[in-house]
Amino acid sequence: MEKQTGRPSQLITRKFANELHLNFMKYRASIIAKYIKKEDANAIWFSVEELENYIHYIKAKGKKTGFDVNGIRIYFGVYPDQKKYAEKAGLMTVFLQATGKEIRKAPKEGEVQTFALMMDSGEQDVSSIEPMNYGSIGRPPSLNY
């Protein structure tokens, strides 16, 4: 697949990004902080190199395990409140999970394939590919979107 360098259609304005983040801080972070009695993470940072490496990895592993990887689903999570997680213990995180469609081989000559098997299964989490985590917990230096 050729790399696209055009402007992505999903871009938003800095003003709207600021509004989204302020809404999160007002309607989610403040409630969470009262419950866990400490300030939670409000951003997670991954380097471009880490993300590109993960994308390359999931495409290659998907192909090896019979999946056409077509996306990444981002899940929210919370680290266990255990010492081994140090400063991340009890804090929010995100992890990335490859999604895709199982590659279906065409039936051999003379074989009949049922309608159910021919149907598209849609974007599903690819359980044969490990999720990615361990970005840097960030508290953005300022809301300068």
Q: For the regions a protein language model found, what residue spans apply to each?
A:
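Detector for the mature cores of small, proteolytically processed
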Residues: 1-49, 53, 60-70, 78-145
